[in-house]
């Protein structure tokens, strides 16, 4: 379905981003990877799916590096057809104790980076009259939790940005939608489970049950693969008129 097209996925060397990149690659999209840590492993996994893969290590908190990444992607493949704004970080603290520099970092990476990348991707998408912008928000783009002020503010902002971009391009072949996951078992979340087990002197299974039981009625993690299938749907002809949606895949979290 996406053969000959290019997908740029920010924060895609592991976790949700890598799952999304794999799903798009299985549909034939060439991939621009971005992120930190191991690059060669994810790159090889994607290349094994028969697509071209390149990497750019832009720091998503820096607009100049985002611009360099978008220029690089265009030089490699002509244009970005599918932009997935997935890069994100977290910091947890009560508001009065929240370090201002952490607030700025979360807003820069979780929200502003999507603005910068989208602004730069749109002209070529509009010229081609086809494009898909997929913002990875969170259930925290719909609801809130204590001690996550910056994250919740950024993800609510990302949902708002999604709607504006969708409306501004509603008569074109460019769509913009958001994915709002609940708990996803990524290496980052596994660390939270491990820490909870250690602190409570309980098993990892019990720590997992506690984590899910607090928020997610299904008592199941969403998987990166499931999120990837939703991204593929957004790219399909069936989703041509799906515009400005914040689609939660959260096991019933936001329904409560």
Predicted feature descriptions by range:
Residues 138:
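Residue(s) in the substrate-gating loop at a strand-loop-helix junction
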Residues 3, 143, 232, 243-256:
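Short C-terminal tail/terminal secondary-structure segment
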Residues 118, 154, 162:
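Active-site helix of classical SDR
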Residues 6, 13-15:
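Conserved glycine-rich cofactor-binding loop
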Residues 27-42:
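Conserved glycine-rich Rossmann-like NAD(P)H-binding loop of the short-chain dehydrogenase/reductase
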Residues 94-95, 102-107, 133, 212:
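Substrate-binding pocket helix/loop in short-chain dehydrogenase/reductase
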């Amino acid at each position: 379905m996406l053969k000959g097209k290019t997908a740029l996925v920010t924060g895609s060397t592991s976790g949700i981003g890598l799952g999304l990149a794999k799903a798009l690659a299985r549909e034939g999209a060439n991939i621009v990877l971005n992120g930190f840590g191991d690059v060669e492993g994810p790159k090889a996994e994607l290349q094994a799916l028969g697509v071209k893969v390149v990497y750019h290590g832009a720091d998503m908190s820096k607009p100049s590096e985002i611009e360099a990444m978008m220029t690089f992607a265009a030089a490699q493949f002509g244009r970005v057809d599918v932009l997935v704004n997935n890069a994100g970080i977290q910091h947890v603290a009560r508001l009065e104790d929240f370090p201002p520099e952490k607030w700025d970092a979360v807003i820069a990476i979780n929200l502003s980076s999507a603005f910068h990348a989208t602004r730069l991707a749109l002209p070529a998408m509009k010229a081609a009259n086809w494009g898909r912008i997929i913002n990875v928000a969170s259930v925290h783009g719909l609801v809130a939790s204590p001690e996550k002020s910056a994250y919740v503010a950024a993800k609510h902002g990302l949902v708002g940005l999604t709607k504006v971009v969708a409306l501004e391009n509603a008569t074109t072949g460019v769509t913009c939608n958001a994915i709002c996951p609940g708990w996803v078992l990524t290496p980052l979340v596994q660390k939270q489970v491990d820490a909870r087990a250690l602190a409570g002197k309980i098993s990892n299974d019990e720590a997992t049950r506690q984590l899910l039981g607090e928020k997610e009625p299904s008592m199941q993690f969403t998987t990166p693969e499931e999120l990837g299938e939703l991204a593929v749907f957004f790219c399909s002809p069936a989703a041509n008129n799906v515009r400005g949606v914040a689609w939660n895949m959260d096991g019933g979290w936001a329904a409560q």
